[in-house]
Amino acid sequence: MPNASTPILIVDDEEIVLLAIAESLIPEGYRIVRTTSPFDALEILKREEFAVIISDHHMPGMTGLEFFSQAQHIQPRASRILITGVLTLKVVVDAINKGEIFRFIAKPWIREELLATVKNAIHRFELVSKNAILEEQTRETNSSLRQTCDELAKQNAILTKQLSEREMTFE
C-alpha cells in the first residue's frame, strides 16, 4: 500500500509537467523526487531506491526509452512508466524490448488513470521485491539442505562401513 515512504522518481524536461504530476501524487502520500534531466536522474537512481520511475519520452539529450534502458540496469525492480504525447508502434515495441516499461500514459493524462497506474506499479514493485527475498531464502535453504544431505551421506557411509565390519566379525 502506498505511504509516505513510497518513493517515486519523475523525469521530464518540462517543469510544468513535473509539477502537474507531483501535484497529483503528493496528496496520495507518495514521496516525490523530480528532475528535468535524465542524466541527473541516473545519478539519483545510483543513490536511492525507487518503487516507481515516471519519465517523459521526448527529452533533450536522451529519450525516455534510452533513460529507462539505463535505469533498468541500475534499479531492475523499479516499475517504469512512460509518459508521451506521441505513441507510435516503434516506441511501443522499443519500450517493451529495451526498457521493459510497466505502462504507458498518454499526454494529456487523466488524473485517475495516473493514480491507478502508479498504484498498480507500486504493487508490482512490492511483488517483485518480495519475490527476490523469497528467491534468496530458497537459495539459502537449498544450500543448507545440500550441506545437511552431504553430512548425512558421510554419516551413512561411516555407519554402513561399521555395519559391514560387524557383519564380518560375526561370520
Name each model feature, range by range:
Residues T6, T36-S37, T63-E66:
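Acidic catalytic/metal-coordinating carboxylates
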Residues M1-L9:
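Non-catalytic signal-transmission and effector/linker regions of two-component phosphorelay proteins
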Residues L87-V91, W109-V118, I122, E126:
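C-terminal output helix
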Residues D56, T84:
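Active-site residues of response regulator receiver
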Residues M59:
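Receiver (REC) domain active-site loop signature in two-component systems and cognate sites
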